[in-house]
Swiss-Prot record:
<dbReference type="GO" id="GO:0043123">
    <property type="term" value="P:positive regulation of canonical NF-kappaB signal transduction"/>
</dbReference>
<comment type="function">
    <text>May be part of a signaling pathway that leads to NF-kappa-B activation.</text>
</comment>
<keyword id="KW-0963">Cytoplasm</keyword>
<dbReference type="GO" id="GO:0005634">
    <property type="term" value="C:nucleus"/>
</dbReference>
<comment type="similarity">
    <text>Belongs to the IRAK1BP1 family.</text>
</comment>
<dbReference type="InterPro" id="IPR007497">
    <property type="entry name" value="SIMPL/DUF541"/>
</dbReference>
<dbReference type="GO" id="GO:0005737">
    <property type="term" value="C:cytoplasm"/>
</dbReference>
<protein>
    <recommendedName>
        <fullName>Interleukin-1 receptor-associated kinase 1-binding protein 1 homolog</fullName>
    </recommendedName>
</protein>
<dbReference type="InterPro" id="IPR030312">
    <property type="entry name" value="IRAK1BP1"/>
</dbReference>
<dbReference type="Pfam" id="PF04402">
    <property type="entry name" value="SIMPL"/>
</dbReference>
<dbReference type="GO" id="GO:0006955">
    <property type="term" value="P:immune response"/>
</dbReference>
<keyword id="KW-0539">Nucleus</keyword>
Length: 245
């Protein structure tokens, strides 16, 4: 069986200054060849980058309920615990704007049931741990604290997408500079920059575990992004060594 020739991959190309010998159609059909609008020389390169962003927010919900023979008793029981939770959170450095309380009151046969849910948003995960540990220690089993739900704000995701794209552009520019330097030219301004692909995914390696540490939950919720761009740069004339003055 004949040996297969290795496939050559063109990652950058230079257009000659005088391209009249080649037809425009031939140039456009060749991978990596770019036809300059004004007959100038250009270099076209690809660039890629990959970054990750850990979640910047977490939400914990604290459920409180009480069933009593009278409505006043049920409301009073829940209200006392809500006041303690609010006081503990304030002392733990949580501001009012990050606390949301919802209440529901029901009559079941001869009893009254009062339920309340306190949802708390944390941007400091050390505060999250210390506040939750304190509430678990101080409150009885009638209070249920949900596992933290980690997520990304829109600003965090936009920053990740912007930075990974800029990283890909920077890598493409470095590649173009190296190509130009190799052939004795210098790199000019960017003519075209186009993002070809943007991918995002999460690390699901440990998501099936029933009980995870805070660090494992953060790792599982981390979002990864990869960007690939194509860029065309102007090529300047050959480099000349500066004369010593």
């Amino acid at each position: 069986m004949a040996a297969t020739s290795p496939v050559s991959r063109i990652f950058a190309s230079l257009q000659p200054a005088n391209s009249s010998a080649l037809h425009t159609g031939d140039l456009e059909n060749r991978a990596g060849i770019v036809v300059g609008q004004h007959g100038g020389r250009e270099v076209q390169v690809s660039g890629s980058a990959e970054l990750s962003a850990a979640p910047d927010r977490a939400q914990v919900c604290i459920a409180v309920s009480s069933s009593k023979g009278t409505a006043a008793e049920a409301k009073s029981s829940v209200q006392r615990r809500l006041e303690y939770i609010a006081q503990s959170l304030r002392q733990g450095g949580v501001t009012e704007e990050n606390i949301t309380v919802s209440k529901e009151f029901q009559r079941l046969s001869n009893t009254y049931k009062m339920e309340a849910v306190v949802c708390v948003v944390f941007s400091d995960f050390d505060k999250l741990q210390s506040n939750c540990n304190l509430l678990v220690e101080k409150l009885d089993s009638s209070v249920n604290i949900s596992p933290p739900h980690f997520y990304h704000t829109a600003d965090c995701l936009e920053k990740l997408r912007r930075e990974v794209c800029l990283g890909a552009v920077a890598n493409a520019r470095r590649k173009a500079q190296e190509v130009c330097r190799l052939v004795g030219h210098s790199l000019g301004k960017a003519l075209i920059i186009r993002e070809e692909e943007l991918r995002e995914w999460e690390d699901q390696a440990e998501s099936s575990q029933a009980h995870q540490s805070i660090q494992s939950k953060i790792k599982t919720a981390t979002i990864y992004a990869a960007s690939k761009i194509l860029a065309t740069f102007e090529i300047k004339g050959k480099e000349r060594h500066k004369k010593n003055r």
